[in-house]
Design a protein with these regions (language model features):
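A short, N-terminal "cap"/entry segment at the start of jelly-roll beta-barrel domains
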Residues: 1-48, 63
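Compositionally biased, non-globular sequence tracts
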Residues: 12-28, 93, 97-106, 119
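A short glycine-rich, His/Asp/Glu-containing loop-to-beta-strand
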Residues: 36-57, 64-65, 69-77, 85
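Beta-hairpin (beta-strand-turn-beta-strand) motif
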Residues: 52, 76-80, 86-90, 120, ...
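A short local loop/turn or secondary-structure capping micro-motif enriched for an aromatic residue
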Residues: 56-57, 91-94, 133
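Short, conserved beta-strand element in jelly-roll/cupin
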Residues: 68-81, 87-89, 97-108
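Conserved metal-binding segment of the jelly-roll/cupin
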Residues: 115-133
Length: 133
């Protein structure tokens, strides 16, 4: 997991080949007027924009998830977003089977750590990171 601000996003371009186009896409957007929905940017790179108000820690854990293939970059545009995290290796209570079509495994475990994102901060969740939301 990586937590940082958009100002430092360029430091992570070398971590994964899709990080640079993802962050360049974000930088080119008017974040205060961004549309809600799913958008394919390029092969293997999809943006899901959710403009909902940030969730509390309690509401976030209702969807405690991880992915086998995808990496999530989640951005707080404005406000305060509470998130939960736990290493996948410590999760022992799967909530159903892995959904290959959606690339998601849900867990009933509780996060080890809660943290907040505020204006223009992002988090990158890798497959070994179980996160909420």
């Amino acid at each position: 997991m990586i937590i940082d601000t958009l100002q430092n996003a360029h430091k992570y371009y070398s971590v994964h080949p899709l990080f640079q186009p993802a962050f360049e896409y974000i930088a080119a957007q008017n974040l205060t007027a961004i549309e809600t929905g799913k958008f394919d940017i390029s092969d293997g790179l999809k943006v899901i924009n959710n403009t909902a108000v940030g969730k509390t820690a309690e509401a976030s854990v209702a969807k405690f998830e991880c992915h086998n293939k995808n990496i999530d970059i989640q951005l707080c545009i404005k406000g305060d977003e509470q998130m939960g995290w736990k290493p996948r290796s410590k999760c022992v209570l799967p909530n159903g089977d892995y959904n290959e079509e959606k690339d998601v495994q849900l867990y009933l475990d509780q996060p080890d750590t809660f943290f907040s994102l505020t204006d223009h901060q992002f988090v990158i969740f890798f497959p070994e990171d179980v996160h909420a939301p």
